[in-house]
Each structure stands twice: as C-alpha cells, then as structure tokens.
Amino acid sequence: MHESSLLKVQSFVENYVNFKSSLPIKVLDVGSMIVQKDSPSFKSIFQDKGTQYIGLDVESGLNVDYVPEDPYSWSEIPDETIDVIVSGQAFEHIPYFWITAAEMSRVLKPSGLLCLIFPSAGAVHRYPFDCWRFYPDSAQALTQYIGLELVEADTEQSGFRKRVRTDWKETLVIARKIAAHDEVTSTRLRSIVASSPTTEFVYHRVDKGPAIAQYEKTVKVSIVVYGLRYSLIPIARKFVKKIIRYDKRKNKIAKNH
C-alpha cells in the first residue's frame, strides 16, 4: 500500500463519509490483501469508527475476509448492501476490470460511495499481471458505464515539494450511486458480469518480433548524437540563458547609475 493512497482515502473519508448513521456502515475493500507484513491498509482508517469492514481479494491472506468463488461474480454479496467501496492499486492487476466495476455498482447502496485509486504511470509490476493505466477520462467512461455519478477525478503529477512518492502518478476517483438502479441498468450490469470469460486469464510472455526490431533500428542514434542531444546541448542552453540573464542585470544596473 502506497502512503499516498492511504492519505487519499483518508481525505475521501473525512470529506464524504458520514459516520453518524444509527446503523454500522458497511465498507468493502476490493484488493485488500496486505502483501508486505508491515504495510498499512485502508482498514486502519475505518476500524475505530464502528464500521463493518470487509476485505475482499482473490486469494486468502492477511487482511482478507472474503474470497469470492468467482473473482468476477460476488454472488455471496446481495444487491445494494454496501455503503462504501474502496480499492487501491488493484484495478491495474485485474484483466477485465470493467466486470469488477459492474459488481461494485451492483452491491453499492443508493447514495453509496466508491473510491478508486490506480496508477497512470510507473514501471510494470506484475501481481500476477499488470494490464492497465488510468486517467480522469478513464474514470468518466467507467462510471458512466456502470451507472454511477462521477464526483471527483484527478491524476497526481510529480512534485518535488511532496513528502510522498508520486512516480506512479495515481488517479483518484470518487463516485456516488445516486439512486437504486432501474431494471434496465440492473439487467445491463448482470449482462456485463455474465460476460466474464469461462477460462482463467493466463499470462504468456511475448517477446519482441521483427516489426519492433526494425522500429528500434530505425530510431536508434549514435552515441555521439545521443550525447549532443541529451548532454551537451542542454548544458549549452543553460549557459546561454545565464549569459542573457547576466547581461540584463548588467544593463539594468547601468541604467540606474
């Protein structure tokens, strides 16, 4: 769990989740497994607030309460019974994430809230797959597809003045289920879930072929050109800018005297 994700969900909870309800709030954390023992989880945000926290993942492990028989069909969870759904760093690892999103929409109560966090950049990190990257427009398309209202969507940019890592450039999505789904929407969501492949997704390594090899040969430059482009030329530009700034200051001082 990235520290940035934990802080994003903390902000989501403080700004959107109302804990004054007489009934315990049901929270579903999709992709909840703690892989590294000392890693934090979203559970820490909810555990002291009288909520019913359910950690869902595709296999048993630390911080996992529920492993669905079918990862794309949570038949054990009734329709519209969850108040809040959170998920961080999970969707990029789900081959058919839109089916998972449809199930989220199905189990979410009317006025229920959804908070998703996923990367828009970063190195490949298979667990066991790494299939996708997401942007605010991805959030717009996905929430419309599953019948939710998009409330917030933003992709974090890198910054030197931040105390958390930003190299993943995480996209934060907050959405709301305005009302109970009508029969048309419910039927469509069920059809999305029913479209789940009958066979498990299996990763097969695919190496470079002749097309990629030809492209790389075409765009490759010599070490001399590379050095000029990415080393000497930038240095020269900075040097010229410094000279220009120096001349401007010198002229300004001369005018004042």
Name these PLM-found stretches.
Residues 1-21:
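Class I SAM-dependent methyltransferase Rossmann-like catalytic core
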Residues 3, 64, 68, 88-91, ...:
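Short N-terminal micro-motifs specific to bacterial/archaeal maturation
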Residues 15-21, 42-46, 147:
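Alpha-helix termini
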Residues 16-23, 161-165:
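Intrinsically disordered, low-complexity coil segments
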Residues 25-125, 135-140:
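Conserved SAM-binding loop
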Residues 95-109, 113-240, 244:
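S-adenosyl-L-methionine-dependent methyltransferase catalytic module, highlighting the catalytic core
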Residues 237-257:
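Low-complexity, charge- and small-residue-enriched intrinsically disordered regions
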